[in-house]
């Protein structure tokens, strides 16, 4: 980013922070705050504020590119080593990024955002609300400002959980170490006598009802979804679909050959024939379809397990997009479009030099841009400059 581009974005950010009444987190004086500045390396950390006005004055003066705060509460948040801060508890943070979703590198920006939102909805509704029983007012949802979503669980039940307890929550959501014998149950349904007292037991493998709570019902619903999806496809398309769930060509063919109309009806009734290959295949695909990616990429420790995590401040701006870290009502999550709803800058035309071809839809406008000079609305210019696709260009 050249100097002119940096100064342009800083002016726009400064104007936003001068006029925005940013809500601070509860017990804000017990939080650590951190900042990354434009054109400067590193992070300014170990800062706390006693008054909201002190914080607002600071961000107007410094105009940071990124603003973070601690999910933890500290007795002394301003101290410069973690052991001296005296930890007092922490919110439970979930950070889903498009880069964590399999195949995201092959998707457009809009497609990646839509995919990660689907996984986020699954996390919030299926796991946090349904399985763990949190109330909606205990879940604070935000668009990250770039490529993902954050969920802050503020329930008193989680504040004192240590890292290992938080890891158990992650393991449950990811389906780690999910046992086949918990999901699939064998039951003796008949005995065949052969003389001299010999009997052969007839076993039936049963799957849970789709309306059961937790992973049992979740697996059942997913199995039925897969079956309904593949039963109307021709053989090659069905094999391709099964392979998309991580199944090999050979195993996919075996599944297709195994599933008859009669077996499909039996599975719908909660019964599946004794076939270890079939049950393992469907369990694997169900896990891949349901499990939510929670680990933070290449970082050493997943965000959710970190009891001292720094997370983006809600309603601050993201320095690489210009988008707002936008709060989202749970009821509106399905319809939330970050490329429309998190855009806060205006339509004033700005002259830029586009450095590489761009194809993106923002604020319901589709832009297909080529390398060269062009006039663009502020919101798009800031987005492209932040991403490194353009820079301010004088007359």
What do the predicted segments below correspond to?
Residues 298, 305-309, 314-325, 332-380:
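C-terminal accessory/binding modules appended to enzymatic or scaffolding proteins
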Residues 388-394:
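A short, conserved structural fragment
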Residues 1-144, 155-163, 168, 175-291, ...:
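Signature for HUH/AEP ssDNA processing cores
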Residues 149-155:
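A short beta-strand motif that forms the metal-chelation/ATP-contact edge
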Residues 383-384:
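Basic amphipathic alpha-helical segments that dock to polyanions
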């Amino acid at each position: 980013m050249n100097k002119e581009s940096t100064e342009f974005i800083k002016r726009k950010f400064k104007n936003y922070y001068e006029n925005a009444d940013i809500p601070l987190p509860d017990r804000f004086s017990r939080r650590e705050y951190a900042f990354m500045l434009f054109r400067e390396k590193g992070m300014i950390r170990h800062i706390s504020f006693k008054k909201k006005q002190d914080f607002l004055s600071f961000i107007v003066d410094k105009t940071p590119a990124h603003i973070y705060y601690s999910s933890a509460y500290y007795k002394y948040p301003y101290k410069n080593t973690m052991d001296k801060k005296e930890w007092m508890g922490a919110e439970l943070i979930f950070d889903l990024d498009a880069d964590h979703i399999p195949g995201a590198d092959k998707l457009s920006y809009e497609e990646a955002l839509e995919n990660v939102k689907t996984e986020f909805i699954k996390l919030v509704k299926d796991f946090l609300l349904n399985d763990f029983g949190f109330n909606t007012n205990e879940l604070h949802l935000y668009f990250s400002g770039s490529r993902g979503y954050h969920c802050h669980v503020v329930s008193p039940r989680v504040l004192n959980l240590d890292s290992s307890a938080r890891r158990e929550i992650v393991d449950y959501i990811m389906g780690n170490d999910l046992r086949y014998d918990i999901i699939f149950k064998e039951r003796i349904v008949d005995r065949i006598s052969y003389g001299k007292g010999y009997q052969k037991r007839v076993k039936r493998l049963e799957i849970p009802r789709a309306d059961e709570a937790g992973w049992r019902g979740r697996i059942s619903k997913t199995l039925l979804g897969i079956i309904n999806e593949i039963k109307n496809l021709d053989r090659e398309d069905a094999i391709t679909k099964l392979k998309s769930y991580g199944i090999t060509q050979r195993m996919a063919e075996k599944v297709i050959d195994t599933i008859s109309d009669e077996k499909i009806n039996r599975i719908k009734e909660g019964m599946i024939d004794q076939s270890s290959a079939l049950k393992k295949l469907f369990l694997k695909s169900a896990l891949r379809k349901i499990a939510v990616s929670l680990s933070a990429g290449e970082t050493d420790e997943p965000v959710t397990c970190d009891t001292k995590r720094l997370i983006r401040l809600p309603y601050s701006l993201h320095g690489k997009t210009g988008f707002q870290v936008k709060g989202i009502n749970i009821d509106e999550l399905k319809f939330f479009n970050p490329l429309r709803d998190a855009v806060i800058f205006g339509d004033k035309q700005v002259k830029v030099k586009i450095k590489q071809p761009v194809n993106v839809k923002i604020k319901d406008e589709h832009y297909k841009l080529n390398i060269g000079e062009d006039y663009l609305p502020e919101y798009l210019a800031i987005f492209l400059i932040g991403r490194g696709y353009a820079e301010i260009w004088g007359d």
